């Protein structure tokens, strides 16, 4: 499951038409049921929940891989379960069920996995695709009577068990400035009120500013480009310079770039800015707002 083009908009169509087209809710519910039954699995070392693929059909093997595109899913699950209301409001309604609780827990777990795709890299930016280590055969979430416990937080310890679950292939280490994870963080913050989602979103945005913000090219008297970093600089020096330059208001910037390798410091830029990068700016700028500043739900 790599494309949000259909699934994501089923529930949004239902909500944005004030529930007047229930067929879209039914289609969403059917899609989510299939995802929960066939595509959710646990990682081998820390029981992170992943939304995997079955490229050969339901009778084929599970392929433990997540594209960044899939990270729209946790926020959308929470949006659907609560109808766009806060979790406290939704749980107070007589229509709330134990299955809604399970959906919210699933949203939390998938959000954590998507956040792990950022934390696993040296730049703090997600690769386009992450593969995962799972048991053989994979343990499906649907096969367990109760959810398996996963780490409450993804530790910064380089030897933390959760890191062993990630396998980022060399051809998948590029970052195209996609907005799916930060969108889910925004929904999770607005719906649950959990501060960690604001913190994760802001940390993510700071990484984008640090590593993808492009300065105007500086040249010496002979017209040669002055490089921001020298080839023999150590990683800590590069990190310090990157952090300082985003605060330098005297510099002129010319946009943000996709990068070719999230595990290189500094990462090689591609000198192109994707159109959907602008959406990434929308959500971090709303994350600092308290719930009573902007009303997103009109009854």
Which stretches of residues belong to each language-model region?
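Glycan-recognition and catalytic cores of secretory/periplasmic carbohydrate-active enzymes
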Residues: 1-299
